[in-house]
């Protein structure tokens, strides 16, 4: 199974649509996913904004719609966009670090599986040449894209957002479970969210 999927991932797909179809048909992690594979992602070649989160939760696995949950509601509020804009693939691409629901662990969902990034992420990014801003939501996305440039904590990384601009903007995960973090770091919504909204507005309206 893994060998076959690795071969498929090595294929050069003529269009983004064919690549997305191949990703959605991927079964590389079948044996490790409690509810089976259902890759959830979306992208259009003209998108200027890329949203990179963790992995779909149970509700998103059920609906097949990314960020179709309370976390998504808060994220859209941060961005200052409604659902019509958020789900407009010509403006915003949504590619998590893990494309399928990974199941539950102690205290929350399991981490995103690494196979997705290994097999597909580089190809997907290469098919999105117009991306100007990538939102790195949570430490899995920040670890992958920022590497050693990350700070010691997520809060420090978010505070240092200007070091990663204009290409990246590191954000905490908007999950309701992170409410204590938001209360402890009230500067985030006061200082960083307005900057985020201004960038999103400028790019989404082009």
What role is predicted for each listed range?
Residues 2-204:
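A polyanion-binding, active-site-adjacent surface
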């Amino acid at each position: 199974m893994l060998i076959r999927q690795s071969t498929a991932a090595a294929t050069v797909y003529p269009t983004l649509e064919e690549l997305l179809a191949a990703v959605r048909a991927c079964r590389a992690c079948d044996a490790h996913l409690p509810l089976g594979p259902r890759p959830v992602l979306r992208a259009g070649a003209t998108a200027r904004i890329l949203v990179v989160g963790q992995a779909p939760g149970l509700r998103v696995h059920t609906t097949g719609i990314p960020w179709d949950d309370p976390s998504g509601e808060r994220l859209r509020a941060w961005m200052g966009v409604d659902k019509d804009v958020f789900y407009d693939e010509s403006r915003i691409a949504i590619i998590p670090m893990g494309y399928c629901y990974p199941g539950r662990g102690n205290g929350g969902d399991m981490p995103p599986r690494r196979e997705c990034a290994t097999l597909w992420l580089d190809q997907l990014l290469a098919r999105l040449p117009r991306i100007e801003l990538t939102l790195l939501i949570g430490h899995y996305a920040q670890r992958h894209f920022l590497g050693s440039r990350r700070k010691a904590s997520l809060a420090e990384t978010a505070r240092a957002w200007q070091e990663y601009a204009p290409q990246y903007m590191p954000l905490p995960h908007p999950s309701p479970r992170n409410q204590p973090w938001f209360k402890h770091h009230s500067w985030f919504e006061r200082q960083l969210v307005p900057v985020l909204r201004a960038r999103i507005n400028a790019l989404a309206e082009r």
